[in-house]
Regions:
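An acidic-aromatic substrate-binding cleft motif
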Residues: 123-158
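N-terminal accessory beta-strand-rich subdomains and adjacent acidic, glycine-rich linkers
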Residues: 1-126
Length: 158
């Protein structure tokens, strides 16, 4: 696996053709997951939900992006991760490049290329070395299906 840390306000990493892009949500109600980077971004229709589910700065962005981290699944089968090691950044796919921009000025970015689990593990390790780790005890979690509210209809439930 190739791994490096670079310091910059804006980072650009050549990836080769991007087939899929992993977008990380702004918070727990924001969309996260693998998407086609060539598909148009559709804003959340309802203004109240849009303000609560998406970063207002990027709610009407024409390009898909991830909060702090993005991963490209490339045509050659490799995965390339560009991840901020400080909050307040965004990563977007741009044809054969991952582009990151920090709202906090110059920051450290992790660039990792390898298998999917390797690049995600490298990011987790880099973040925990910077930000620390919580205890390993049981945690109570809350699961929300609110992101589906716009698509739920009486007919779909029945």
């Amino acid at each position: 696996m190739d791994l490096r840390i670079e310091r910059a306000r804006e980072s650009a990493v050549e990836t080769g053709r991007i087939e899929r892009f992993y977008r990380h949500g702004w918070h727990s109600w924001s969309p996260s997951g693998w998407v086609d980077p060539n598909e148009p971004v559709v804003p959340i229709r309802d203004e109240g939900r849009r303000l609560g589910h998406e970063d207002p700065e990027h709610a009407f962005a024409s390009r898909v992006g991830g909060s702090c981290v993005g991963v490209a699944r490339c045509a050659d089968g490799a995965y390339v991760l560009l991840g901020a090691l400080t909050p307040g950044a965004r990563v977007e796919p741009d044809e054969a490049t991952l582009r990151g921009v920090s709202e906090a000025g110059e920051i450290d970015w992790l660039v990792a290329r390898g298998a999917m689990n390797e690049v995600f593990d490298a990011y987790v390790n880099a973040l925990t070395s910077r930000l620390g780790r919580r205890g390993r005890g049981r945690m109570r979690v809350w699961c929300s299906w609110y992101s589906y509210c716009e698509d739920i209809t009486e007919e779909a439930i029945e």
